[in-house]
Amino acid sequence: MKQSGIDQFSGKRVWVIGASSGIGEACAKALILQGAKVALSSRRAERLDQIALCGDVNQSLVIPLDVTNDEQLQEGYKTILKAWGGIDLLLFVSGMYVPLRADNFDI
């Protein structure tokens, strides 16, 4: 049976990469408040610590990393595996908005 409502993510193990601001932060907070275990990653560790405090600190992992560094991503994954045994959902929302016209960049 499909879960719905507030308990849809309860107990799920979620890794949010890009969790320190914007969409990533909003998703991370919502997931924490819905009872998910959330691993928070970005380069800004102090910001991740603040976000982790929006819920039970035992349901969050703070894993500072730079997404351009493959070794850091692998170590982050290993940290989650050791703590929780796996990941149910990955949200990769790292990045930033750069206002450019469509004809000014390559796709």
Where are these regions (language model features)?
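A conserved hydrophobic alpha-helix of the Rossmann-fold in NAD(P)-dependent oxidoreductases
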Residues: L48, L73-I80
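N-terminal Rossmann-fold NAD(P) dinucleotide-binding loop
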Residues: G24-E25
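Conserved mid-core segment of classical short-chain dehydrogenase/reductases
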Residues: Q74, Y97-I107
